[in-house]
Regions:
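Hydrophobic core of transmembrane alpha-helices in multi-pass small-molecule transporters
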Residues: 99, 110-129, 354-384
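Short amphipathic helix-loop junctions that connect adjacent transmembrane helices
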Residues: 35-56, 271-295
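Conserved MFS/SLC helix-loop-helix module at the cytosolic interface between two early adjacent transmembrane helices
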Residues: 72-104
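Intracellular loop-helix junctions on the cytosolic face of multi-pass helical membrane proteins
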Residues: 1-18, 139-143, 168-289, 312-322, ...
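C-terminal ends and interior cores of transmembrane alpha-helices
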Residues: 94-112, 335-360
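Transmembrane alpha-helices of Major Facilitator/SLC transporters
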Residues: 70, 213, 290-322, 333-341
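Central cavity-lining transmembrane alpha-helices of secondary-active solute carriers
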Residues: 58-79, 161, 299-312
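Glycine-rich segments within core transmembrane alpha-helices of 12-TM secondary carriers
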Residues: 68, 146-179, 188, 196-207, ...
C-alpha cells in the first residue's frame, strides 16, 4: 500500500498537463504575433504593413512588449482579491483573442493600437495566474514542484518555437502575393500579416477551449475563488513585524540584480526589433533555393532553450557548478550577451556596415551564420541569468514581501523592453556598427562589474546560495 502511494506521489497531477497545454497555446498566440509585429509595423501599406519608420516602430514594439510585463502586477492582484485565478485566466485569454482578432480584421493604425491594448490587458490577467495554478497543484515543500515548473516552461518554449514557423509560412509564402504599385508600376511583394494574426487568434482560442472544457475535471476547486479572509488577516499580522538587518541587506541584493537584469534584457530584446529588421533586409536567408521567412528566426532562441536548458541544469547541479555563485553566473550571462554582439558586428562588417535602403545596397547580404551564432550565445547568457535570477529572488525575499519582490523583479523586463525599443530606434539613425558596439561594450563591463561585486554581494546574502 505504501509503495503504491509513493508511486502516485512521484507522478504529476493531470492538472499540470492541462496547464501545460493552456500555456503552450497562449504562448503560441503571443509569439506568433510578436514574431511578425516589427515587420507589420515597418512594411508599406501595399506590402501589407503600416508604413511606420523604423524608429517609431521600435518604440511601439518596445513599449507594447514591455507593458505585457507590467500589467501582470495588476492582474495578479485583481485575481487574488476579486476574480480568482481560473476566471482571470479565462478573462485574460478572451481579451487576448479579441486583441489578435482586431489585428487581423483592422489593417489600420487604430486597429494596431486597439489590438495591442487588448493584448496588454489580457496578458495581465492571464500570465501571472496560469503560473500560479502550477504552484497550487502541489503542497508546500513538494519536491516535484521544480520538475513541474520545468515541464510548464517547456510548454511555453514549445509554443514560442512553433508559432513563428507557422506565422512566417503564412505571411511570406501561403498568403503572400505580387502586386503592382499603381504609382510606379513596380511589382512588389504583399505579405499576409493579417493571416499571421488570425493564426495567433486561433491559437488563443484553442487555449481557451482546452481550459474551459477540462479545468473542472483536472483542477477541481483550485483557483476558483479569490484568496482572502484568514489568509489576509494572517498576512497582515506577519507584515507588522519589522525587517531585520539581514532581510534588508538581502532586499538590497535583489535590487542590485534587478538593476543589472534591466541592462541584460534591453540588449537581449533586440532580437524582436532591430535584429528582425536587419535580418529582413541584410541577411542572406536563401538556403537551397528556399528563402527562409524572417519570422522563423524568432524560433531559434526557444529551440536553443529546449536543447540547452537540460545541459545547463545538469551543469549547475554538478559538483563544480554548485561552487559557482549567483553573481558569477549572472555576470557570465551579461558577458555572453556582449560576446553575442560580436557576431552581429561580424554580419555588419561583412557587408561594409551600411544600412542604406537603395537596391544596390540591399543587394549585399551577410551570412545567416552570424545571426544563428548571436542567438546561440545570447541563449547561453539567458540561461545563466534568467532562471538563476528567479530562483535567487525567491530565496532572498522575506516571506511577507515574496510576492511584491517577485513582481518587482518581473518589472525589470518592462523597463528593459521599453529601453530596448528606445535603443533599437537609434540603429537606423546612428548605424548598427555604433549601436551594437556600444551595447556589447556596456553589457560586458556590467558583467565584469557583477563579478567584481561577487564577495560583497555574497556577504549581504547571508548564506543564501
Amino acid at each position: 500500500m505504501d509503495t503504491n502511494v509513493e508511486n502516485v506521489k512521484k507522478k504529476h497531477p493531470k492538472g499540470l498537463y492541462l496547464v501545460f497545454l493552456t500555456g503552450m497555446w497562449e504562448r503560441f498566440s503571443y509569439y506568433g504575433m510578436r514574431g511578425i509585429l516589427m515587420l507589420y509595423l515597418t512594411k508599406t501599406f501595399l506590402e501589407g504593413g503600416l508604413a511606420f519608420d523604423p524608429q517609431t516602430a521600435s518604440l511601439i514594439y518596445g513599449f507594447a512588449t514591455g507593458l505585457t510585463y507590467f500589467t501582470p502586477l495588476i492582474g495578479g492582484w485583481i485575481a487574488d482579491n476579486f476574480l480568482g485565478q481560473r476566471k482571470a485566466v479565462l478573462l485574460g485569454g478572451l481579451i487576448m483573442f479579441f486583441g489578435e482578432f482586431v489585428l487581423f480584421a483592422m489593417h489600420s493604425h487604430i486597429g494596431l493600437y486597439l489590438g495591442l491594448f487588448l493584448l496588454i490587458i489580457g496578458n495581465g490577467f492571464f500570465k501571472p495566474n496560469i503560473s500560479a495554478l502550477v504552484g497550487g497543484l502541489y503542497e508546500p515543500g513538494d519536491k516535484r514542484l521544480d520538475s513541474a515548473f520545468s515541464i510548464f516552461y517547456m510548454g511555453i518554449n514549445l509554443g514560442a518555437f512553433l508559432a513563428p514557423l507557422l506565422t512566417g509560412l503564412l505571411t511570406d509564402n501561403i498568403f503572400a502575393s505580387n502586386v503592382t504599385n499603381p504609382e510606379t508600376g513596380e511589382i512588389v511583394m504583399s505579405f499576409g500579416y493579417k493571416y499571421g494574426f488570425l493564426a495567433a487568434a486561433i491559437g488563443m482560442l484553442v487555449s481557451e477551449v482546452i481550459f474551459l472544457l477540462f479545468a473542472q475535471k483536472y483542477l477541481g476547486d483550485l483557483g476558483l475563488h479569490p484568496k482572502g479572509g484568514k489568509k489576509k488577516v494572517a498576512d497582515a499580522q506577519v507584515s507588522d513585524a519589522p525587517l531585520t538587518k539581514e532581510e534588508k541587506e538581502r532586499i538590497t541584493v535583489i535590487f542590485v540584480y534587478f538593476f543589472f537584469a534591466i541592462f541584460f534584457f534591453a540588449g537581449f530584446e533586440q532580437a524582436g526589433s532591430s535584429f528582425t529588421l536587419y535580418t529582413d533586409k541584410f541577411i542572406d536567408r536563401v538556403v537551397g533555393g528556399f528563402e527562409i521567412p524572417t519570422a522563423w528566426f524568432q524560433s531559434v532562441n526557444p529551440l536553443f532553450i529546449v536543447v540547452l536548458a537540460p545541459v545547463f541544469a545538469s551543469f549547475w547541479n554538478s559538483k563544480f557548478g554548485q561552487t559557482l555563485t549567483t553573481p558569477f553566473k549572472m555576470g557570465t550571462g551579461l558577458i555572453l550577451l556582449g560576446i553575442g554582439y560580436f557576431f552581429m558586428l561580424g554580419a555588419v562588417y561583412e557587408r561594409g556596415g551600411s544600412i542604406g535602403n537603395d537596391p544596390s545596397d540591399m543587394a549585399v547580404k551577410a551570412s545567416l551564420a552570424w545571426l544563428v551564432l548571436t542567438y546561440l550565445t545570447h541563449t547561453m547568457g539567458e540561461l545563466c541569468l534568467s532562471p538563476v535570477g528567479l530562483s535567487i529572488v525567491t530565496k532572498l525575499s522575506p516571506p511577507k514581501l515574496a510576492g511584491l519582490l517577485m513582481g518587482v523583479w518581473m518589472t525589470a523586463a518592462f523597463f528593459a523592453n521599453a529601453a530596448g525599443g528606445v535603443i533599437a530606434s537609434y540603429v537606423e539613425k546612428l548605424g548598427p556598427s555604433i549601436v551594437f558596439t556600444v551595447i556589447s561594450g556596456f553589457v560586458i563591463l556590467c558583467g565584469l562589474g557583477m563579478v567584481l561585486l561577487n564577495k560583497k554581494l555574497q556577504r549581504m546574502m547571508h548564506g543564501v546560495k
